Amino acid sequence: KLWRKNIVGIVILIASDERIEKFRHPVPTEKKVKKSVMVVLGARKYGLIVSLTRIVHFGKLPEDLKRKHFAVCKVDTALISSTKKGKTIGEVFSEGIKTYRITGYPDEWQKHHQGGPTGYMTRYYRATKKINEIIKENYAFAWNPSITGTKSEDTIITNEENQIIITEDKNWPLLRIETEKGEFLRPDILIK
C-alpha cells in the first residue's frame, strides 16, 4: 500500500510476542505471530520522513501490558506536550525522564533512545538532556519512548502555539491522556 501512494518504507521493523520484550528496534524474522505484533515504520515521501509505531494484540490484553502501555503513552504525551517553540530539546527530554519516574518505570529510558528531531533523516540526532538547541516553529520531531514490551511513537511538527501530530490515525484506537496542558490522544494497542 505504501508504494501505491509513493511512500517509501526506509525503516520497517517488526516483532511478535516475546521478541517485542527483547528488541526495541526489532529486525524482522520469520517468527509467526501468536498473540502480539509491533510494527515500527519510518517512511519517506517528497524527501521528508515520518516515524510511527503501532501494536496489535490478539485476544484479551494482559493487565501488565495495559498498564505499561498507558505509562509509555504518558511519557510520550509529556514529550509531545513539552515540544514547544522556545524550549530546549534538553528541557523536553528531561520532562520525559521525569514522567518515566512518575509512572513507576524510572530506568526504562536508559534501555533505548527517546527519539529527537526528524525531517530529511529518521533522526538528525538522539535527544539528551544536555542538548541546548532551542525549538523553533515548524520543527519536526519523532519521540519514541518505550517500556519493556511496548512503545509509543508518532511524528509531530511544532507550530506557533503547540504541536501537530502528523501521523495520527483517527481510525486507530486512541488513549486519552489528560495533562495540565489539555487532553492528548495517543495510539492504544489494537485488540483483534
Q: Each predicted region: which residue ranges?
A:
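Active-site neighborhoods and metal-handling regions in enzymes and metal-associated proteins
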Residues: K1-K192
